[in-house]
Regions:
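Structural recognition of the beta-strand scaffold that forms the well-ordered cores
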Residues: 12-17, 42-48, 83-86, 104-107, ...
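Aromatic-lined carbohydrate-recognition surfaces of secreted/lumenal glycan-active proteins
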Residues: 79-93
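Metal-dependent DNA replication initiation modules
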Residues: 70-74, 83, 99
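Structural recognition of alpha->loop->beta junctions
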Residues: 32-46, 50, 96-120
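Substrate-binding cleft of extracellular glycoside hydrolase catalytic domains
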Residues: 1-72, 76-78
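Active-site beta-loop-alpha junctions enriched in small/polar residues
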Residues: 18-20, 49-51, 88-90, 110-112, ...
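Functionally critical loop-and-helix segments that line ligand-binding/catalytic clefts
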Residues: 100-146
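Extracytoplasmic/secreted cell-surface and envelope-processing proteins
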Residues: 24, 53-58, 92-97, 116-117, ...
Length: 146
């Protein structure tokens, strides 16, 4: 991502896709390398899209929760801002991050308002495949709660 070139265009943030099969230290090291420490950036987003069911070797729920806690702490220490957690429904059902972390939530469910988290969402991806002439690729249609 070219932050210097895009600073004038729109507010930016760093996103990281949590991998429950990998330790947090390596994941946060990649984030710290790619995302500058800049107070003008929006809060970082941690995408929680994959459960440990896809890992090549067994990873316990406790290990996933521990590594996620470590990742959240490291990302927030780097950014200086609380992270926004973006769990998909399957991840929320498996690990309940909306109960474990007092952070803003970005939920995803096409067309129907998501109700799978323990708290209200700040952001909602209402359509992941929105097509418009304004873009060559499908866009995410995101609703922000006032």
């Amino acid at each position: 991502m070219q932050y210097a070139d895009e600073r004038e265009e729109a507010p930016r943030s760093g996103e990281i896709r949590f991998d429950p099969c990998a330790v947090a230290d390596g994941q946060s090291a990649n984030f710290v390398t790619m995302v500058p420490r800049d107070s003008d950036l929006l809060p970082p987003v941690i995408l929680l899209e994959t459960t440990a069911d896809q890992c090549p070797s067994r990873v316990s729920d406790a290990a996933v929760q521990s590594e996620l806690t470590t990742l959240v702490n490291q990302i927030e220490a780097h950014s200086g801002k609380p992270a926004i957690l973006a769990p998909v429904e399957e991840f929320e059902a498996a690990y309940a991050p909306s109960r474990r972390f007092d952070r803003q939530l970005w939920l995803t469910r096409s067309w129907v308002e998501p109700d799978y988290a323990s708290r209200p969402w700040l952001m909602w991806t209402a359509n992941r495949w929105y097509k418009t002439e304004a873009a060559q690729e499908p866009l995410r249609w995101v609703v922000v709660r006032p």
